[in-house]
Amino acid sequence: MTNIRKTHPLLKIINHSFIDLPAPSNISSWWNFGSLLGICLMIQILTGLFLAMHYTSDTMTAFSSVTHICRDVNYGWLIRYMHANGASMFFICLFLHVGRGMYYGSYTFMETWNIGVILLFAVMATAFMGYVLPWGQMSFWGATVITNLLSAIPYIGTTLVEWIWGGFSVDKATLTRFFAFHFILPFIITALVIVHLLFLHETGSNNPTGLNSDADKIPFHPYYTIKDILGVLMMISFLMTLVLFFPDLLGDPDNYMPANPLNTPPHIKPEWYFLFAYAILRSIPNKLGGVLALILSILILALLPFLHTSKQRSLMFRPITQILYWILVANLLVLTWIGGQPVEHPFIIIGQLASISYFSIILILMPISGIIEDKMLKWNL
């Protein structure tokens, strides 16, 4: 008798995706982050669902409802902090996942990569709208500043901003629609994740060498299921340490003050995972230019397949590009630091230099180093 998992219409799909899936035998722990992101998404949807049961999306009661969740709901504090810090874990895994893709040349799977870039935008939009919901000072002013950037769009800008706000300022209408979008987007993200996996399974996984691994495949289960479980346990340990010992480490103290349109916080800044993009935005003195740079700082990922000049896919055997890659990582850390600093000397010039080098490394230096390495190997024939 044939195993039911190989014959049943539904189980067959699961079998081909997670059990009998042929996987390269040499993929390292950098390939764990896909499954970790899936777990993060599940944690966020579940904790978010339970939070939504007690949250009210009204300017008068939003802040109080979050306080009520933390004080009166059974384990409400745990659910709330798991959701808030779960977002941070989500972005840590996302950045490492994208970084892995850049290092090992996974962007040559064009469809998978482009869906991934769309997913990144969707997750960023969801996180931004979620940050507005507690209706603290930083929620309100963050929403005001970021939505206001759309007014830089010529001709339709102001109308567009007022349309998004649902009035002449960030108010009740804005909060209600942000809650609606924040609720629906994770389900759209889940659908996109399925498409992401669909495209990935068309080609099969990449591996650290960047070479074709068809000759050496192993079944996903038990080898990579057990490996993924180890990764999940490590991530959950880290998340729970954060939640139970340092729940406010990554948050902003200003968000413990109810939103007040008459009082601007001294330093308006987003959550840590947006700081690199915020630094790029602020480094350009022109409003429209800043907005374009902000969008391009993420959209540049979609250009990577076209900027690949080397005859090798991975950076594993490309020392010059490796150095540039790690300079880029350090550069992003500098941008993250600058994004959280006030707009004054010397932070302004550091931010501008870091922004220039960010785009230069990706658009100019890495493609050139790819050509140089090919020449050194006499592969440019």
From Swiss-Prot:
Main location: mitochondrion
Residues bound to heme b b566: H97, H196
Pfam families listed in its UniProt record: Cytochrom_B_C, Cytochrome_B
GO molecular function: metal ion binding; ubiquinol-cytochrome-c reductase activity
InterPro entries named in the record: Cyt_b/b6_C (IPR005798), Cyt_b/b6_C_sf (IPR036150), Cyt_b/b6_N (IPR005797), Cytb/b6-like_sf (IPR027387), Cytochrome_b (IPR030689), Cytochrome_b_C_euk/bac (IPR048260), Cytochrome_b_N_euk/bac (IPR048259), Di-haem_cyt_TM (IPR016174)
Keyword Electron transport: yes
Membrane topology: Multi-pass membrane protein
Residues that, per the record, bind heme b b562: H83, H182
Residues that, per the record, bind a ubiquinone: H201
Cofactor field: heme b
Domain of life: Eukaryota
PANTHER family membership: CYTOCHROME B
Subunit structure: The cytochrome bc1 complex contains 11 subunits: 3 respiratory subunits (MT-CYB, CYC1 and UQCRFS1), 2 core proteins (UQCRC1 and UQCRC2) and 6 low-molecular weight proteins (UQCRH/QCR6, UQCRB/QCR7, UQCRQ/QCR8, UQCR10/QCR9, UQCR11/QCR10 and a cleavage product of UQCRFS1). This cytochrome bc1 complex then forms a dimer.
Function comment: Component of the ubiquinol-cytochrome c reductase complex (complex III or cytochrome b-c1 complex) that is part of the mitochondrial respiratory chain. The b-c1 complex mediates electron transfer from ubiquinol to cytochrome c. Contributes to the generation of a proton gradient across the mitochondrial membrane that is then used for ATP synthesis.
Protein's name according to its UniProt entry: Cytochrome b
Organism: Apodemus alpicola (Alpine field mouse)
Classification of source organism: Eukaryota, Metazoa, Chordata, Craniata, Vertebrata
